C-alpha cells in the first residue's frame, strides 16, 4: 500500500506528468497533512461494495426440476407453491437443473421433482446429496427400490403384502412364456422393470399378442414382469410422508382405456379424472396397506398405487417421487400440502444442524 504519492508535472506547451514517486507523511506541510487526514477519513468511511443483505432464510433447499419434461411429477404452479411454503418456514427453495450438479453441496437439502431413474442424473444427484450429508428426498435407496418393478415386487412378496399374481419372464427362457396363460389367464399385463406413468406396460388378450408383445419388450430388457389383469374403474393413490398418510386420491382410468394414462390419445382423453379426499374418508384398509407397503421402502415421500376389487385389495406399486400437481393432489389440503412437505425438510435439516440422528 502506498497512501501518499507525489506527482510532478512539466509543461512543454501542455502540462504532462513527469514523475510519480511514493513519499512519506513527514514530507507534508501542515496544510497538506490536514488535507491528507480529511481524505483518509473520507476513504475509510466509503463502502466499496454493497453490504450483504441480512439473511432471511435459515436453510437453503435445492429443488431439482426439468422445465422440458412432458410429464413432470409437479406442474409449474405446484413448484411455485413449494417455493412459497418454504419461504414461510425460513427455507429458501432454489429450482435447479441437471446442469447444477457442481453447486449441489452449497445447499442444506435436495428435493427431487423430476422423474427419477437409475440411469440418469436424478440418481447421481441423490447419491451426491447423501454423501454430502444433505437432507434428500428422494433418497438413493428409495429410488433404487421403487424404480425397478421386479425388485419392488420381490420386496412386497417378502413382506407378504397382497399384490396381483405375478411371474417373472426371462428373455432366454421361452418355455416360461408358454406357461403364462395357464398361470395367469387372459387378459394379462406385461411390464418393463423401469416403466413410469403407464409407459412400458402392455395388456395382451391372447397367445399371439402375448408372444408379439414379449418379443418387442425383450428388445429393450432381459426381464419382463407379467401380472394378472385386475380391472377397476380407478386406482387408489395414497401419498405417504415419513410413514404418515398425507393425501388420498382416486385416479380414474382414461376414457375408453384400461390405464390412467393413454399415451396414444390426444387432449383431455390422455388421462382420466381424479377425486381427492381427506385421508380419514378413504377406506381404512387402503390406508393401512399403503403404510405397510412404504414401511418396506423407507421414511421419504411416496405414492402408493392400489387396486380394490370387491373384497380384494392389492398393492400395484410404490412410487418414489410421486405426482404432486396443483389442482389435483392438493385439491383437499391446498397450501397445507406444500407446507407439510417443507416442514418435514425443516425438521430434518434442523436435526442435521444439531448433529442429531434421524
What is the role of each PLM region?
Residues 15-22, 107-112, 238-241, 306, ...:
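A short beta-strand motif that forms the metal-chelation/ATP-contact edge
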Residues 202-294:
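Phosphate-binding site of ATP-dependent enzymes
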Residues 164-187:
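Rossmann-like NAD(P)H-binding beta-loop-alpha module
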Amino acid at each position: 500500500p502506498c497512501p501518499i504519492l507525489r506527482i510532478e508535472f512539466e509543461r512543454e506547451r501542455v502540462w504532462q506528468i513527469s514523475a510519480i514517486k511514493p513519499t512519506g507523511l513527514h514530507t507534508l506541510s501542515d496544510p497538506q497533512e490536514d488535507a491528507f487526514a480529511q481524505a483518509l477519513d473520507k476513504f475509510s468511511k466509503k463502502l466499496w461494495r454493497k453490504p450483504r443483505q441480512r439473511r432471511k432464510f435459515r436453510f437453503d433447499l435445492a429443488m431439482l426440476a426439468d422445465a422440458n419434461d412432458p410429464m413432470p411429477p409437479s406442474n409449474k404452479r405446484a413448484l411455485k407453491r413449494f417455493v412459497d411454503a418454504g419461504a414461510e418456514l425460513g427455507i429458501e427453495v432454489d429450482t435447479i437443473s441437471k446442469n447444477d450438479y457442481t453447486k449441489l453441496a452449497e445447499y442444506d437439502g435436495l428435493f427431487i421433482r423430476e422423474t427419477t431413474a437409475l440411469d440418469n442424473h436424478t440418481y447421481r444427484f441423490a447419491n451426491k446429496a447423501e454423501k454430502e450429508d444433505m437432507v434428500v428426498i428422494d433418497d438413493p435407496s428409495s429410488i433404487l427400490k421403487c424404480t425397478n418393478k421386479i425388485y419392488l415386487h420381490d420386496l412386497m412378496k417378502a413382506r407378504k403384502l397382497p399384490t396381483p399374481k405375478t411371474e417373472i419372464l426371462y428373455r432366454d427362457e421361452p418355455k416360461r412364456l408358454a406357461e403364462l396363460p395357464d398361470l395367469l389367464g387372459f387378459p394379462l399385463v406385461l411390464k418393463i422393470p423401469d416403466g413410469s406413468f403407464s409407459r412400458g406396460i402392455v395388456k395382451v388378450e391372447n397367445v399371439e399378442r402375448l408372444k408379439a408383445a414379449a418379443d418387442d419388450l425383450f428388445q429393450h430388457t432381459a426381464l419382463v414382469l407379467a401380472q394378472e389383469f385386475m380391472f377397476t374403474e380407478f386406482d387408489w393413490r395414497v401419498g405417504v410422508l415419513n410413514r404418515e398418510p398425507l393425501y388420498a386420491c382416486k385416479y380414474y382410468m382414461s376414457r375408453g382405456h384400461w390405464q390412467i394414462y393413454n399415451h396414444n390419445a390426444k387432449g383431455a382423453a390422455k388421462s382420466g379424472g381424479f377425486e381427492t379426499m381427506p385421508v380419514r374418508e378413504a377406506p381404512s384398509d387402503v390406508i393401512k396397506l399403503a403404510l405397510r407397503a412404504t414401511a418396506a421402502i423407507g421414511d421419504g415421500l411416496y405414492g402408493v398405487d392400489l387396486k380394490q376389487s370387491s373384497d380384494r385389495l392389492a398393492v400395484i406399486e410404490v412410487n418414489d417421487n410421486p405426482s404432486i400437481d396443483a389442482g389435483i393432489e392438493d385439491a383437499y389440503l391446498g397450501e397445507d400440502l406444500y407446507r407439510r412437505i417443507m416442514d418435514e425438510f425443516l425438521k430434518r435439516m434442523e436435526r442435521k444442524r444439531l448433529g442429531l440422528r434421524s
